[in-house]
Amino acid sequence: MQIGNFNTDKKVFIIAELSANHAGSLEMALKSIKAAKKAGADAIKIQTYTPDSLTLNSDKEDFIIKGGLWDKRKLYELYESAKTPYEWHSQIFETAQNEGILCFSSPFAKEDIEFLKRFDPIAYKIASFEANDENFVRLIAKEKKPTIVSTGIATEEELFKICEIFKEEKNPDLIFLKCTSAYPTAIEDMNLKGIVSLKEKFNVEVGLSDHSFGFLAPVMAVALGARVIEKHFMLDKSIESEDSKFSLDFDEFKAMVDAVRQAESALGDGKLDLDEKALKNRVFARSLYASKDIKKGEIFSEENVKSVRPSFGLHPKFYQELLGKKASKDIEFGDALKESDFR
């Protein structure tokens, strides 16, 4: 799939998710974009919303978070604190372009989509908690841009509906990310085999949105067929934000990128044909050799013929055929046996 100038068929698409790791500072956001590029990210992703895009400014119990990193915080207050202000977007997209890193965003309401259109984004991202909103999904599908969907809390029925909507809107560029909507995610809760299930069941391109510590999961995900990896990124460990507890700093993210690139390199193309290096090593394969001096007319037997390394003699498949035949000439111990040596 083509996302901007990036082809996911050729390389795994690695996204640095900035989210709230700007910590309320535009300067921090711009520095993060530059650092993400240096760390090897293919794209920086932001989130485009106002608190009103996501929730109501209510003090009722329904709108108070219970448990986890954000325990007892009011939803509206959380999103007000974590947002990337509209007025930052122009500089964010401009900086990304200047740095040579792709940039796109997750909108959360119609107003956010309309705002983002002025930047002609290369793609859109639908967050896990918005995946059940069919009207919102359709608005995104109508934009005819590659769309990445986190599937963390979506049911199979909802995912099938997303596929149906994108088909109806004639938008074929859909990617499902396996995602566990827990912040942070325990490694035993990842269910990475779900990447394979998403690919097989929905026939879409797949990847991983990872909220676990470290980068074991992204490397394993690549081995399972992930073509997109999304991981939260921050400049350094001194940052305190709503997302910093499960984000990678520069050194960690760079190490993850290196590991992912090694993993995809190790996968190869899946062909079983021997490559040039393997063919060269065939010299150490077994072949048939004289294990004793053999006189002309002497019968080849288990006593004077062995299958040994290296491979300059007859292929071992001729061993049984050779036994019982007579030598056509004198053969010395250690000579590689040839077809001309027997009759």
Curated annotation (Swiss-Prot):
EC number: 2.5.1.97
UniProt entry keywords in alphabetical sequence: Metal-binding, Transferase
InterPro entries: AFP_Neu5c_C, AFP_Neu5c_C_sf, Aldolase_TIM, Neu5Ac_N, Nonulosonic_Acid_Synth, Pseudaminic_synth_PseI, SAF
Any single Pfam family the record assigns to this protein: SAF
Domain AFP-like residues, every copy: 287-343
Secretion signal span: none
Catalytic reactions of this protein: 2,4-diacetamido-2,4,6-trideoxy-beta-L-altrose + phosphoenolpyruvate + H2O = pseudaminate + phosphate
Protein family membership: Belongs to the pseudaminic acid synthase family.
Protein name, entry field: Pseudaminic acid synthase
Organism of provenance: Campylobacter jejuni subsp. jejuni serotype O:23/36 (strain 81-176)
